[in-house]
């Protein structure tokens, strides 16, 4: 959509969340001339990257009265993307080699990601826009604007009116738990990966881990360091799958899905194998959940599809005053947050115009029909995967910003291939030094780093 020639408007905008999405959204909104208030329940920026050894009071996170811990980070977590392709486009996530307290590895720990986000917030003076320890309890449309009710840690309640609201609250708090026939009578323990922190509690146990992607692959191998046996139940595997993996302790097996959980403590897999397990760990993802949002029925979550959303961002009936940043998965997350937020900021200012409500709905209906034809279930609507860069470049063209760099796209593709083929070593052994070199040369050309690329590549 071509930029408009109308006078640029400045809006009063509420941003919900001060994680990676909220931070870059606040920056882009302010760059576009908007006034911004960011709400976050934590004491510092970083969102889910704020590690806590604490977990929900309910290990499965099903009890609605549970004490909730708003992070899903486990102690051993390292990024599953190379740092140079993970960072924001104009603030590279490069090693702070001169600082011995920092993690200079190419696939660093969660603590290094938090430090990077704190660096970003300081560099762009974002913290001055954030109300820390403040929870948004209700957001609803009122006379063309938005009512935002919040309360802080000492119980002070506030009610304010904003021109627009951008939801950057993430989707890693409300766990999705696998349906297992017979599980109600199964006597063992269950926990969702949201509440997993360290392997110690599983010492000498037989553990079944449901899920073998990202956190499932990591957590199963982490637990295997101390457990007697670890058995992975993978929905992606064929029904007869049964494979013993030699790493890390020769006590790890991959199976097909669970068929039944029995009262005697046994777990029957669809491959016919039976295991007597102490604990089941659900690495089964999360549900989209916006308990504070009241839109009078305009928005619905249907089988984990947030609908109807135009390009995963705008709700046609309330666009552009309500938008979402960061809903899609299987994408270059921080870059996606940045490009989506540039679009939202430009649309709110009037510099870029959205299609009409009818046109946006037509696009959404056509997209849903395409997913149906391809046999993609509703729950995967927001998983981009192979189309992620096409999606991001489409938005970039809309708001006249740079597309995703080729080296970044290739790094993600090759990194994913390594992760699938060598999950134990892909973070420490790689074959794309050429792309890493291209990335640092790109940073140098754009004057985003002060040192010569060789300083980072040879360290």
Curated annotation (Swiss-Prot):
Catalysed reaction, written as an equation: a (Z)-omega-(methylsulfanyl)-N-sulfo-alkylhydroximate S-glucoside + NADPH + O2 + H(+) = a (Z)-omega-(methylsulfinyl)-alkyl-glucosinolate + NADP(+) + H2O
InterPro entries: FAD/NAD-bd_sf, Flavin_mOase, Flavin_mOase-like, FMO-like
Name of the top EC class for this enzyme: oxidoreductase
Pfam families attached to this UniProt entry: FMO-like (PF00743)
Binding site for FAD: 17-22
Disulphides: none
UniProt note on tissues of expression: Mainly expressed in leaves. Low levels in flowers and seeds.
Catalytic activity, EC: 1.14.13.237
Keyword Cell inner membrane appears in the UniProt entry: no
Binding-site residues, NADP(+): 211-216
Keyword Methyltransferase listed: no
Role summary: Catalyzes the conversion of methylthioalkyl glucosinolates into methylsulfinylalkyl glucosinolates. Able to S-oxygenate both desulfo- and intact 4-methylthiobutyl glucosinolates, but no activity with methionine, dihomomethionine or 5-methylthiopentaldoxime.
Family stated for the protein in its record: Belongs to the FMO family.
Protein's recorded name: Flavin-containing monooxygenase FMO GS-OX1
